[in-house]
Amino acid sequence: AHYHSFGHALIYIPKAAELIHYLGEGVAPPVLLCLVRSIVTGFREDLIPEFSHYGDALSGFGQGQNGRPPSLEAFAGLNPAKAMALTAEHGSAPPAELYASLLAVNAQNMLTFDLRHLQDIDQPYGSDRGWLDFSHGLTFADAVYSLCTRYPELWPAGLLQMACFAGRNAGYDDSDVILEDWMVSDPQTFFQEITAMLMDHGQSEYIVSVHLLKTVQAVKRLYALPQVGAASQIALAALNRLLSSSVRRKMVRRTARQAMHFIRQDT
């Protein structure tokens, strides 16, 4: 029930099952060994200061009387602690409705990401932001839906961890970015063209090509969920903007300054 490995553990579990299903039982031992090793050695993010309120929020989840999900605007500017507290207060709302609300928040954060933050060079480790920080919120949301609809008892943990992502990525928005500019008029054609592009992506780093692939597939599944309502449109628009923007990977000055700052802490 804790926040494990920045959400990667939850993402890997259904994907490992899918991989074994497609490739056959013969690949099960190495795939499962890798999965178990990653779970055993993964970090508990609920123990770091940024997410330290997770345990309390999980304990108090659903004890409030508010049975309606908070609006998208209610999450605006909330840090992880406040985003989790708001989610827990509304924990008696139907899980699917609360999920749609949190998906909309994470999708909105990604859609409105201020690209000027890609040029930040004086930020300490962990505080700089890039596209992968935001796309991870959607791929994690996809995994939450996959597992929590199968194991409903996991909804509180999954929803609160979505709130962690929402709060962590708050405050990096560009107010000039609006939904209408990035809405996709023909989703079916859009996904067909993007899938074809992914087969000839031209990316030199596997981490970029793989993240693009899993984000496209996650948004495709999320868009097909009728119960998430307008959140699906926001997620699709966010993906459209991501694919229309460059994914800068080399941050030489940022890396150098972060390294010097890190070393100075020990001198």
Predicted segment positions?
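Mature, well-folded catalytic/scaffold domains that follow N-terminal targeting or propeptide regions
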Residues: 1-267
